[in-house]
UniProtKB/Swiss-Prot annotation:
Disulphides: none
Name of the protein: Receptor-like protein 18
Bilayer-crossing regions: 781-801
Cytoplasmic side: 802-826
Gene that this polypeptide is encoded by: RLP18
Protein's organism: Arabidopsis thaliana
Cellular compartment(s): Cell membrane
PROSITE patterns linked to this entry: LRR
Chief localisation class: membrane
Keywords of this entry: Cell membrane, Glycoprotein, Leucine-rich repeat, Membrane, Plant defense, Repeat, Transmembrane, Transmembrane helix
Amino acid sequence: MRCQVWNVIELNLSSSCLHGLLNSKSNIFSLQNLRFLDLSNNHFSGQILSSLGNFSSLTTLDLSENHFSGQIPSSLGNLLHLTSLDLTDNNFVGDIPTSLGNLSHLTLLLLGANNLVGEIPFSLGNLSHLTDLTLCENDLAGEIPSSFENLSHLTNLDLSQNNLVGEIPSFFGSFNQLVSLAVEENEFTGNFLLILLNLTNLSDLSLSRNQFTGTLPPNMSSLSNLVLFYADANAFTGTIPSSLLNIPSLSCFDLSDNQLNGNIEFGNISSSLSDLLLGNNNFRGSIHKSISKLVNLYTLDLSHFNTQGSINFSIFSDLKLLVDLHLSHLNTTTTIDLNTFLSSFKSLDTLDLSGNHISAINKSSVSNPVTTARPGLGLTNPLLLSRFNLSGCGVTEFPEFLRTQQTMEILDISNNKINGQVPGWLWTLPTLDYVNLSNNTFTGFQRLMVPSSWQPSMNYFSGANNNFTGNLPAFICAFTLQALHLRKNHLSGVFPENISESLKSLDVGHNQLVGKLPRSLVRISSLEVLNVENNKINDTFPFWLSSLEELQVLVLRSNAFHGPMQQTRFPNLRIIDVSHNHFNGTLPSDFFVNWTVMFLLGENEDQFNGEYMGTSYYSDSIVVMNKGLEMEMVRILKIFTSVDFSRNKFEGEIPKSIGLLKELHVLNLSSNTFTGHIPSSMGKLRELESLDVAQNKLSGDIPQDLGDLSYLAYMNFSHNQLVGPLPGGTQFLTQNCSSFEENAGHFGPSLEKVCDIHGKTMQESEMPGSEEDEEEVISWIAATIGFIPGIAFGLMMGYILVCYKPEWFMNVFGKNKSRSTSSTTR
C-alpha cells in the first residue's frame, strides 16, 4: 500500500489468497484516488461491478488469474488515464467492449485466457501507444481489423488460439518494433507474408496450426534475431530455406506436419539449435551423419522421414543432451542394440522408434544395465526413460532393458510379434502410468512379483488383440486404472468382483466370459464405457447400472442376456447396443423419457463438436451397425448417438417416446416381432441418419414426416406388413428397392421411382430362369462394386491408423511437451 496526503493511491494485494466477491460494499470502492490496483493471482469470483469505472485516476489495473466471470463492463472505457489493463486468465464472456478503444494512453492490454467471443473491435486500433496486446485463448472470430495498422509501437502481439480467419495483413510489415508475433491455432490462410521479413527485431514467430500454404521465402536470414520459429501443422510445400536454419540465434525450430520435401544438410544448421522438429513431412533420402554436429539439441523429431534404407543409429550418439527423440516411421529396416544405443545419452527421457522394422538385440538389463557417464566423476548412472514407444516394429521379444527403467511412465510395445507371458517384473516399475501391449501374441501373465497389498499408480492398460487365456487377471482388475481394454482374447470364467472403482472405460468384448455381470460394477461411479460384446454372459438387463450417472456407452451385444427391459433412467447414455441377445417382452411407451442426453445433446453441440471420448492417453472404440453395415469406430465422437435393439424377441408397439431422442443418429430395431404402426413421433428425429425396422410385424403407413428428415441416408422397412404410399422425400427416392420389399401393401409414385416397376407390384417378383440368372449375375457385380471400395477404404483406414500417431501419444510424447520449456521466453 502507498499513500499520498492521507489518500491511498497504490494497493497491491496480489497472491494474497483472497477470495469472494467484489461488491459495492467492499472497502476498495471507497478508495477513489487509487492510481494502482493489483488483485492478481487470488480467488476472487463473480462479476466486475460497473462502478469500477469510477476510479478516474487509475493508471494500472490488474485483475488477472482470478475467477471473475460475466462480461467485461463497458465502464472500464471511462478510465482515461489507464496505461495497463490486465484481465488475463479469468472466465469473462461476451464481446470485448468497444469502449476500451477510448483508453488512448494504454500501453498494455492483456485479455488472454478467457471465453470472449465476437470480432475484435475496430476501436482497438485507436490505442496507438500499445506495446503489448494479448487476446489469446478466447473464441474470437472474424478478420484482423484494418485499424490495427495504427498499432505501430507493438513489441508483442498474441492472437493465438482463437477462430480468426483471412490472411495476415500486409501492414504487419510496418511493425518494426515487434519482438514476438503469435497467431497459432487459428484459421488463417494464404502464403507466408514476405513483408514479415522486414521485422528484423523479431525474436519469436509462431504460425502453427493454421492453413498457410505455399513455400517459405529463400531470404529468411533477414530475421537475424529469430530465436523461436514455429510453423507446424500447416500446408507449406517445397524445401526448407537453408538461410532459415543458418540464423545464429535460432534455438527452437518446428516445421513438422507440413508437406515439405527435399534433402536436408544438417551440417549447415545453427549449432545453437536446441529443438528441431521436422516430422510428418515428405522428406526423402538418408539422414546424413552431419546431424551429429547438432550437439546442443534437446529435442529432435524426424518422424516419417522416408530414409528408403537402413540407418546407422550411431549417428545420433553424439547428441548426448537429447531429452526427446522421435524417429518413428523412417521406412527403414535395421538392427539396433538398445542397451548400447541408449548408453550414449545423458538425459534422454522420451524415445519413439515406432513404425520401423527393427531387430532389437535384447540383452538382459540386469546383468548389463543401461548406464550413462557422469563427466568428471568417472562414475556411471543408469539412464532412466519416462516414455518409450516401440509400437509396430516387428519385435518378437519383450524388451529386457525395461526391467531397470524405474521412472518409466508411458510404455507402448503394441502391434508387434511378442509372444509368451507378460513378465511379472513389469508391474514393479513404480511410476508406470500407461501400458499398451495390444496386437501381439501374448498368452498369459507371469506371477506378480510384489506383495498382494502393493498397488501401482497405473491409469491405462491395454492387452487387446492377443491370445490371453484363463480368467480375467484379478490383479490387473484391482489396479487403480481409468481404462482397462482386454477385448479380442480367449479369456474365460466369470468377472472378478474386485474391479477398480476408478475405471472410466472397461472393454472385455470378444472373449468367452460366462456368468453374470458383477454387481460390484455399480460402485464404479466414474464409468463412462462398458463393452462386454461377444461373450457368453447369461444375465438379465442390468437396470442397476442406471445409477452410474456418467455412463455414456453400454454394449451388451452377442451374449445370452434375456428377459424384459423396463423403463429406466440413463441420463448420459449416448450409445446402447443390446442386439443379438434374447431380450423379450414389450417396451413401455415411456421407455426413453429419461434418456435425456439424446434429446438435449444438441444444446451443447458446439461444446462437443469434433471432440472424442476418452482422454489424451486413449480413445474408446466400438463396432456399430450403421446404414446396414458393421463399422468399427476407432474413436467415438461425443456427439454420436446410437440405439441398437436388433435381433432380440421384443414385441408390442415401438414406444412413442422414441420421438424424444431428437439427437439420435442411428436407430436399429430390426429382427424382432414389433407390431402396430411406426410411431409418427419418429418424424421428430431430426439428426437421424440410419433407420432399420426390417423383419418385424409392423403395419400401417410409413409416417409421411420421415420424408422430411434431411440426414436420413439409409432406411430399411422390408419384411413387415406395411401399406400405403411411401413418403415423397428425396431421401426415400434414393433408397434401394430392397429396403421396401416384402410389404404387400406399398404403392404410389414414390415406390415406382424407387423400384422402377412401372405398374408391377411387389409380388410380381418371379421371372423366367434366364432373367433370374441375369439378376443373380447383376447382384454379384453389385456386390463386387461394393466390395472393392470397401477394401480400398479398409486399406486407407489401416494406413491412417498405422502411420499416424494416436492422440494420446502426441499429447504425451509430442512437441507440445518440448515447447513448454521455451514458451516462457515469450
